[in-house]
Amino acid sequence: MGEPVYRRVVIKLSGEYFAGDQSFGIDQPTIDRIAGDLIAAQKLGVEIAVVVGGGNIFRGVEVSSRGVSRPTGDTMGMLATVMNCLALEAAIERRAVAARTLSAFVMPQVCELFTRGAAHRYLAEGKIVLLAGGTGNPFFTTDTTAVLRAGEIGAQAVLKATNVDGVYSADPKKDPSAQRFERLSHSQALEGGYKVMDATAFALARETSLPIIVFSIAEAGSIGAILSGTGRGTVVAG
């Protein structure tokens, strides 16, 4: 692989992907594969921060119809992201690479509190930084968290890992005529209503001029391929 396109990025990983072929929980082979991909990508000379969802363990929006308030449900979901980050941290460190989990919540017995200074320091030290706890506030998705944290730590792009190789005009699994876009502007992504990322995340990325690269995580090495400019995906920028 050649020189990396970006030197500091935030990678957004779906919590559901952590479950592997299961409908719930953490699939260790999947976590191990992701850890290996992150380490390989870091070896390209890229400083890597990761935001992980919590949908493999808990989805706050789904319990709001069952008597749990949306703020409480979202908080439970954000705590699920901490568990995912700790599992990924352990998988990375088993490979003799340093990782640190920083949380939006104060939980000193578990992990450090996220601050910009701590994130900058650990990235400069060559550690993979795992950003847990969402924004720390209800009603915001982990997609929005990824864009927010990218702005805070000076990342050059957000890499949004999905189960398809970019943004399509329709669901390619349901519509074989769906068109894949090589590039979209932030405004086009918002106006098109594409479901690959929520509108708040796209709007914040537009406001901060932050590129988002949507790609498939299904194959090993896909993160490194995107970072080296050889991967297949959709660039949302401009």
Curated annotation (Swiss-Prot):
InterPro entries, sorted: AceGlu_kinase-like_sf, Asp/Glu/Uridylate_kinase, Uridylate_kinase, Uridylate_kinase_bac
Pathway info: Pyrimidine metabolism; CTP biosynthesis via de novo pathway; UDP from UMP (UMPK route): step 1/1
Entry EC no(s): 2.7.4.22
Regulation acting on activity, per entry: Inhibited by UTP.
Binding sites annotated in the UniProt record for UMP: G54, D74, T135, G136, N137, P138, F139, F140, T141, T142
Keywords: ATP-binding, Cytoplasm, Kinase, Nucleotide-binding, Pyrimidine biosynthesis, Transferase
SUPFAM superfamilies: Carbamate kinase-like
Broad class of enzyme this protein falls into: transferase
Reaction(s) catalysed (UniProt annotation): UMP + ATP = UDP + ADP
Molecular function via GO: ATP binding; UMP kinase activity
Cellular localisation: Cytoplasm
Residues bound to ATP: K12, L13, S14, G15, G55, R59, T162, N163, Y168, D171
Role description: Catalyzes the reversible phosphorylation of UMP to UDP.
Family in the record: Belongs to the UMP kinase family.
Name under which the protein is recorded: Uridylate kinase
Native source organism of the sequence: Rhodopseudomonas palustris (strain BisB18)
Gene label: pyrH
